């Protein structure tokens, strides 16, 4: 716990007071007495009265302008601020509440609860700006993070302490997949999750919260039994809040990893909005834009966030980041910079969702750097490749089937199609968090069971079984017994 205090120590023995000299939208210029300038990233607080109501605006120092003046970005609306108002330098960067008391609660970028459930029952705080773990602290072992979801564990496995990109349009099951992962990490790994809603719709944040309460991920009756903390900085917030809300969520996750020594899942929805907010702030600060109008510091900002997400010898943060691709252009600097950090991609397919195959993870488009024989083992690798080849061949044959029908195919191709259809159905799985809606109990399938099941399908042991018996089941024994 000593590290916490070293970050929070002020450079001055007492806080200094400055005053606002200029306000342009969410950007403030503040002058301080000589020798009392705040550091970059220090938190400033402006207090005032509006309509007989006291308000306070927190800002973060971004630039030193000279002449004892700093430029800061506000974390909330600047309505009611005027030139000449007093500004308090807190002497440290923004700190947010952390620990078990944050589970089941919703916070804003400042770490203030916004769910009307009263104050957070903790005195422990962590600063949102922290250095990435030093090299000796890192855990360099390559190990798979088992999710209990067949299609993910077999074909695009997650790395413990890795970063995964989640791609998918509206209505293909992103939210349900996220909730299932939160549920499974709690049950199988004794871990917790932090969800950072960065610049997305308020309605989506509300829907997610309601669905989490319904599915039991957030326990209303006993909040302490919840499995996730939520941090929201939605589309209507100023760019300063959207730029920093990801760091607030990350600080909460780092506490669970470094102090509680747990495995943590960190969800960021959406990483593109983090870049977008940084671009807005950069323009407001008067920096020269780079390619496609993005901020010149794009790689640095992305790197400082992503490098803190890693495995250490104490615990791990595995991050799943929804990636919005503007105009479906993968070469756009924002997604291109994100891809450089990803270990795996999980692509959700509308075609599979339309067929009723959930989770609608595309087995051919999803990738992982972990799928190598020296990491996952020869058997896992061979079966994953066999599954992909069978599905790829089925995809190639679909045009012929549509025109000529199945009967015109060779015996070998007909067998491939039959097995591919069984594989496709066996990649579906009932989820714990969907029990409320589907009525069928959820299934956690271990990696060993997953490999055994697909090995039996590929070897032809189950050619005599109808394909429908492979649909929405857990392990292969359920198929055989049905």
From Swiss-Prot:
Q: Which PROSITE patterns match?
A: ATPASE_ALPHA_BETA (PS00152)
Class in the EC hierarchy, top level = translocase
Q: Which reaction does it catalyse?
A: ATP + H2O + 4 H(+)(in) = ADP + phosphate + 5 H(+)(out)
Tell me the residue numbers annotated for binding ATP.
Answer: 168-175
UniProt-listed GO biological process terms:
proton motive force-driven mitochondrial ATP synthesis
Protein keywords = ATP synthesis, ATP-binding, CF(1), Chloroplast, Hydrogen ion transport, Ion transport, Membrane, Nucleotide-binding, Plastid, Thylakoid, Translocase, Transport
Query: Any idea of its EC number?
Result: 7.1.2.2
Q: Which InterPro entries match?
A: AAA+_ATPase (IPR003593), ATP-synt_VA_C (IPR055190), ATP_synth_F1_bsu (IPR005722), ATPase_a/bsu_AS (IPR020003), ATPase_alpha/beta_chains (IPR050053), ATPase_F1/V1/A1_a/bsu_N (IPR004100), ATPase_F1/V1/A1_a/bsu_N_sf (IPR036121), ATPase_F1/V1/A1_a/bsu_nucl-bd (IPR000194)
Main localization category = plastid
Q: What's the short name of a Pfam family annotated to this entry?
A: ATP-synt_ab
Record-linked CDD domains:
ATP-synt_F1_beta_C, ATP-synt_F1_beta_N, F1-ATPase_beta_CD
Q: Which GO terms describe its cellular component?
A: chloroplast thylakoid membrane; mitochondrion; proton-transporting ATP synthase complex
MF terms from GO for this chain are: ATP binding; ATP hydrolysis activity; proton-transporting ATP synthase activity, rotational mechanism
Subcellular location(s): the record lists: Plastid, Chloroplast thylakoid membrane
How does this protein lie in the membrane? Answer: Peripheral membrane protein
Oligomer and partners: F-type ATPases have 2 components, CF(1) - the catalytic core - and CF(0) - the membrane proton channel. CF(1) has five subunits: alpha(3), beta(3), gamma(1), delta(1), epsilon(1). CF(0) has four main subunits: a(1), b(1), b'(1) and c(9-12).
Q: What family does the entry list?
A: Belongs to the ATPase alpha/beta chains family.
Primary role? Produces ATP from ADP in the presence of a proton gradient across the membrane. The catalytic sites are hosted primarily by the beta subunits.
Protein name per the record: ATP synthase subunit beta, chloroplastic
